[in-house]
């Protein structure tokens, strides 16, 4: 496996990404073991030819206490010494191996240090954030490095751990998050890892030590990405996944999981499978399939963007308000209506008839999802079948959860995962029991909808296709007739005369 991982790293180098490797030997690690394993890694890389690999086992030093390195932004007990050696190796396109061993600032001892601290110190150095690490730094200073100057561009942080990607708390197997939007999800995921539910603990789904590993890897990702541009990302995966061949002949969709997540992410800046795809769409589906164990072993992590949801489903579940009772409206002060209208107009490439739209949705609004600074969003409503009055629909439980508008700014479409973030918030947080919507049959976005819905229906004598995410809904269920009734008769609200979207 080591040779296969070394090959992946050399292929990443050919694609423009030069790696720096920090080994983590665990709590029982010794200086001797780390140096031996570092040498093995170096030799494995060297077998793939020039420019090879360089082992630098003296570039980490212990920082003196009460300095900016130990007390300032993102504190670390170690710092980078002999930076000219490190930079020379990287300029030569060599893959650098750095064992987490350090010499004390008094030059009297050499100790094993925490690998995460080493990674944080390296990131601070590359970002130009290493200040006053020692009053008397060891080694010759590099006069070309001015304080605060960015030394190198860190594009990816790759964490290879047998524990694999960050697990999904609500999955019944070992599936993991495919994408984590830190701004939105970090606190909730960390809480789930550190406070497992009783049923999970009883089942022994994830032992305490494994959950601690997952929490540590995610916390490290957050700390490192906090120092990097928003375009940088972290990948948490297994060594075996990193050893996969980057290119294979695929005979069916179910084998796509065997793609190398490192190569795939570098080429696309996306996870192997979109985070908004239903789990069943990306599982192998065949017991005994050798690939099934690798279905969800990689988690892509980004700083992402904040997500605002009104009303907040973590406080109270979305339920239909009583007719005549208080409810959220698009004209409420918490919603920036001009920016919302701009988002819709830009995404649909047509102008919304605002007055007509407000008349139609303001009294049956279920909620609104806003990604970032109105870069994406969704407007959801409670719709009554057109042959019922609101009171009857409410009392009989026939109000339909409906996705009225799903919009992403053109500048954010196809990148950044904005659509995935909004869609996941809708189906996991706001309407976990299902939501329906409609789209023109010739809409190019329909492929994306087909992949994420749990059912579709072409509405006879119309140009509409209806989609829904309601689980376990047979075609004989009368609920589908209510869905169809709503999707068939919703009146569009555009200021132009083009066919409705």
What residue ranges belong to the model's regions?
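Nucleotide/pyrophosphate-binding catalytic subdomain
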Residues: 1-241, 330-337
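Conserved acetyl-CoA-binding loop-helix of GNAT-fold acetyltransferases
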Residues: 414-427
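Terminal substrate-recognition subdomain of acyl/acetyltransferases
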Residues: 262-263, 270-333, 346-359, 409-410, ...
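A conserved beta-strand-loop-helix scaffold within acyl/acetyltransferase catalytic domains
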Residues: 332-414
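Fungal intrinsically disordered, low-complexity polar regions
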Residues: 66-84, 137-147, 171-175, 188, ...
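Short, charged/polar "capping" segments at the starts of alpha-helices
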Residues: 29-30, 242-246, 444-447
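Short, aromatic/basic amphipathic alpha-helical patches
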Residues: 36-44, 247-257, 447-454
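Structured beta-strand/turn binding interfaces of compact recognition modules in eukaryotic regulators
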Residues: 24-25, 160, 383, 406, ...
């Amino acid at each position: 496996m080591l040779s296969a991982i070394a090959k992946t790293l050399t292929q990443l180098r050919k694609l423009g990404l030069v790696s720096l490797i920090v080994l983590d030997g665990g709590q029982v690690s010794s200086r001797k073991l780390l140096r031996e394993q570092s040498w093995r890694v170096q030799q494995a890389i060297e077998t793939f030819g020039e420019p090879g690999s360089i082992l630098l086992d003296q570039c980490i030093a212990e920082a003196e206490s009460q300095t900016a390195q130990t007390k300032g932004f993102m504190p670390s007990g170690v710092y980078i010494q002999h930076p000219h050696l490190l930079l020379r190796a990287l300029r030569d396109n060599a893959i650098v191996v750095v064992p987490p061993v350090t010499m004390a600032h008094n030059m009297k001892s050499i100790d094993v240090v925490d690998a995460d601290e080493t990674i944080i110190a390296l990131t601070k150095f590359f970002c130009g954030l290493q200040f006053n690490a020692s009053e008397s730094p060891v080694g010759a200073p590099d006069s070309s490095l001015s304080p605060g100057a960015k030394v190198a561009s860190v594009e990816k942080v790759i964490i290879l751990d047998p524990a694999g990607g960050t697990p999904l708390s609500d999955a019944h197997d070992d599936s993991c998050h495919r994408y984590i939007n830190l701004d939105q999800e970090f606190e909730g995921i960390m809480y789930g890892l550190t406070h497992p539910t009783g049923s999970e603990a009883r089942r022994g789904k994830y032992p305490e030590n494994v959950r601690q590993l997952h929490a540590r890897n995610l916390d490290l990702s957050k700390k490192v990405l906090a120092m990097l541009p928003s375009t940088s990302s972290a990948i948490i995966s297994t060594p075996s996944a990193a050893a996969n061949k980057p290119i294979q002949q695929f005979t069916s969709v179910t084998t796509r999981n065997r793609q190398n997540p490192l190569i795939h992410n570098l080429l696309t800046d996306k996870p192997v499978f979109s985070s908004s795809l239903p789990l069943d769409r990306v599982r192998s589906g065949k017991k005994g399939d050798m690939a099934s164990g690798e279905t969800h072993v990689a988690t892509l992590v980004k700083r992402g963007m904040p997500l605002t949801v009104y009303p907040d489903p973590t406080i109270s579940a979305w339920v239909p308000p009583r007719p005549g009772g208080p409810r959220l409206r698009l004209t409420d002060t918490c919603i920036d209506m001009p920016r919302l209208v701009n988002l819709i107009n830009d995404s649909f490439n047509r102008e919304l008839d605002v007055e007509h739209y407000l008349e139609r949705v303001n009294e049956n609004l279920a909620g609104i999802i806003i990604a970032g600074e109105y870069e994406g969003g969704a407007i959801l409503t409670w719709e009554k079948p057109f042959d019922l009055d609101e009171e009857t629909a409410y009392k009989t439980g026939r109000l339909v959860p409906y996705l009225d508008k799903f919009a992403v700014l053109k500048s954010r479409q196809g990148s950044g995962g904005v659509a995935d973030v909004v869609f996941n918030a809708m189906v996991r947080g706001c309407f976990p029991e299902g939501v329906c919507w409609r789209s023109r049959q010739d809409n190019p976005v329909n492929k994306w909808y087909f992949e994420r819905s749990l059912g579709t229906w072409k509405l006879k004598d119309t140009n509409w296709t209806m989609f829904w995410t309601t689980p376990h809904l047979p075609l004989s269920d009368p609920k589908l007739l209510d869905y169809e009734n709503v999707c068939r008769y919703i009146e569009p609200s555009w200021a132009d005369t083009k066919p409705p979207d």
